[in-house]
Amino acid sequence: MKHIIIVTSPEVAGRKIQRTLGLVRGNTIRARHVGKDIMAGLRHLVGGEIYEYAKLLAESREQALDRMLAEAEQLGANAVVSTRITTSVIMGGAAEMLVYGTAVVLEE
């Protein structure tokens, strides 16, 4: 995969947008693991970070981001601007991670 610039702003500082290619997105839906739920439940009782869920969310975010970048690369983009990350609960124990933005071609 080629290097694609990702920013949350609508433009890349010091670079001019030559062409806008459109919306790109990547998502993943993950379910919790029963065994990890037990450990997370115990940690919830005593306080502190719930590592099992933090790891699950980090992996989900990376997978969704990779999928968005693959879509941007297919369009010929060298940057994605206005990037956003959202999460939503799909059903009990499952959540969606969605990463989206606008694929663009920046002048070299």
Where are these regions (language model features)?
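N-terminal presequence-like segments and the immediate start of the first folded domain
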Residues: 1-36, 75, 95-108
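Short, well-ordered alpha-helical segments
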Residues: 24, 29, 37-84
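Short alpha-helix boundary/capping motifs
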Residues: 52, 70, 81, 92-93, ...
